[in-house]
C-alpha cells in the first residue's frame, strides 16, 4: 500500500492540540488504501471565520462546520494523483469532542477519515449511502484502534 502524500496547511492562530502530519497521514491512509498510485491531498486546519465563509460560499450554510471536502476532478485523459482538499475547523472539532465526551485525537481521526471518504465519492445524503459511509468509518476507526465514532458514551 502506498502512503497518501499530505500537504498540511495550518491557518489557525492556536496550534496547540493539533494532530501531526504523520497522524493525519496514518488516518488518511486507512481510509484511502491506495494500491497503485500515490495519492496526494491537502489538509487545511482553519479557524471558525474561514470555515464559516467556506461553508456559506460552497454549501449555503451560515455557520462554521467540522470538515469540508473538495474532491479534485480533472478530465479522464489526464492522470494526476491529487484527490482533493479537506478543510477542518479546529474550534468545531474541539467543541464536538468535548460535547460528545470523546478523546480529541479520536475526533480528529474521525474527521480525517470522514473527509477522506468524501474525497473518494462517498456521501451521506440518502439513508442507504449514510449507512454505508458510517459502516466504513466505523470499520476504519476500529482498525486504527479507536472506538466506534457513532457511539456516544455518557
Swiss-Prot record:
Domain of life, per lineage: Bacteria
Cofactor: Zn(2+)
Signal peptide: none
GO molecular function annotation: metalloendopeptidase activity; RNA endonuclease activity; zinc ion binding
EC number from the UniProt entry: 3.1.-.-
UniProtKB keywords: Cytoplasm, Endonuclease, Hydrolase, Metal-binding, Nuclease, Ribosome biogenesis, rRNA processing, Zinc
Compartmental location: Cytoplasm
GO terms for cellular component: cytoplasm
Keyword Mitochondrion: no
Keyword Metal-binding: yes
Cofactor binding comment, as recorded: Binds 1 zinc ion.
Any Pfam family the entry gives: YbeY
Principal subcellular localisation of the protein: cytoplasm
UniProt GO BP: rRNA processing
SUPFAM superfamilies membership: Metalloproteases ('zincins'), catalytic domain
InterPro entries in the cross-refs: MetalPrtase_cat_dom_sf_prd (IPR023091), YbeY (IPR002036), YbeY_CS (IPR020549)
Binding-site residues for Zn(2+), renumbered to this chain: 114, 118, 124
PANTHER family: ENDORIBONUCLEASE YBEY, CHLOROPLASTIC
Biological role stated in the UniProt entry: Single strand-specific metallo-endoribonuclease involved in late-stage 70S ribosome quality control and in maturation of the 3' terminus of the 16S rRNA.
Similarity comment text for this entry: Belongs to the endoribonuclease YbeY family.
Name listed for the protein in its UniProt record: Endoribonuclease YbeY
Organism in which the protein naturally occurs: Histophilus somni (strain 129Pt)
Amino acid at each position: 500500500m502506498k502512503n497518501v502524500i499530505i500537504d498540511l496547511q495550518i491557518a489557525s492562530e492556536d496550534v496547540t492540540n493539533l494532530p501531526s502530519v504523520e497522524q493525519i497521514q496514518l488516518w488518511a491512509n486507512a481510509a484511502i488504501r491506495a494500491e497503485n498510485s500515490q495519492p496526494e491531498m491537502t489538509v487545511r486546519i482553519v479557524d471558525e471565520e474561514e470555515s464559516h465563509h467556506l461553508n456559506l460560499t460552497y454549501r449555503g450554510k451560515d455557520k462554521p462546520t467540522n470538515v469540508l471536502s473538495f474532491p479534485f476532478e480533472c478530465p479522464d485523459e489526464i492522470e494526476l494523483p491529487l484527490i482533493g482538499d479537506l478543510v477542518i475547523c479546529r474550534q468545531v472539532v474541539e467543541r464536538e469532542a468535548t460535547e460528545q465526551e470523546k478523546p480529541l485525537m479520536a475526533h480528529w481521526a474521525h474527521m480525517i477519515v470522514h473527509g477522506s471518504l468524501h474525497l473518494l465519492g462517498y456521501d451521506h445524503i440518502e439513508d442507504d449511502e449514510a449507512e454505508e459511509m458510517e459502516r466504513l468509518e466505523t470499520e476504519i476507526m476500529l482498525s486504527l484502534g479507536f472506538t466506534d465514532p457513532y457511539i456516544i458514551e455518557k
